[in-house]
Amino acid sequence: MRKLKMMLCVMMLPLVVVGCTSKQSVSQCVKPPPPPAWIMQPPPDWQTPLNGIISPSGNDW
């Protein structure tokens, strides 16, 4: 049993040493592309055309 523990310790030691000494690479932040032009335009006015088609219930036919 003691020999097994010693063998595990010897096998794990290189993994621990390599894990502590290696540096993780840091990726650069990617700048997002600018928004498309259609997003920057004001929203369309749907209320005005609809008012000509749909009228309040005051008009009785």
From Swiss-Prot:
<comment type="function">
    <text>Component of the spanin complex that disrupts the outer membrane and causes cell lysis during virus exit. The spanin complex conducts the final step in cell lysis by disrupting the outer membrane after holin and endolysin action have permeabilized the inner membrane and degraded the host peptidoglycans.</text>
</comment>
<dbReference type="GO" id="GO:0044659">
    <property type="term" value="P:viral release from host cell by cytolysis"/>
</dbReference>
<protein>
    <recommendedName>
        <fullName>Prophage outer membrane lipoprotein RzoR</fullName>
    </recommendedName>
</protein>
<keyword id="KW-0578">Host cell lysis by virus</keyword>
<dbReference type="InterPro" id="IPR010346">
    <property type="entry name" value="O-spanin"/>
</dbReference>
<keyword id="KW-1188">Viral release from host cell</keyword>
<keyword id="KW-0204">Cytolysis</keyword>
<keyword id="KW-0472">Membrane</keyword>
<feature type="signal peptide">
    <location>
        <begin position="1"/>
        <end position="19"/>
    </location>
</feature>
<keyword id="KW-0998">Cell outer membrane</keyword>
<feature type="lipid moiety-binding region" description="S-diacylglycerol cysteine">
    <location>
        <position position="20"/>
    </location>
</feature>
<dbReference type="Pfam" id="PF06085">
    <property type="entry name" value="Rz1"/>
</dbReference>
<feature type="lipid moiety-binding region" description="N-palmitoyl cysteine">
    <location>
        <position position="20"/>
    </location>
</feature>
<comment type="subunit">
    <text>Homodimer; disulfide-linked. Interacts (via C-terminus) with RZ (via C-terminus). Part of the spanin complex which spans the entire periplasmic space. The spanin complex is composed of spanin, inner membrane subunit and spanin, outer membrane subunit.</text>
</comment>
<comment type="similarity">
    <text>Belongs to the lambdalikevirus o-spanin family.</text>
</comment>
<keyword id="KW-0732">Signal</keyword>
<dbReference type="GO" id="GO:0009279">
    <property type="term" value="C:cell outer membrane"/>
</dbReference>
<keyword id="KW-0564">Palmitate</keyword>
<keyword id="KW-0449">Lipoprotein</keyword>
<keyword id="KW-1015">Disulfide bond</keyword>
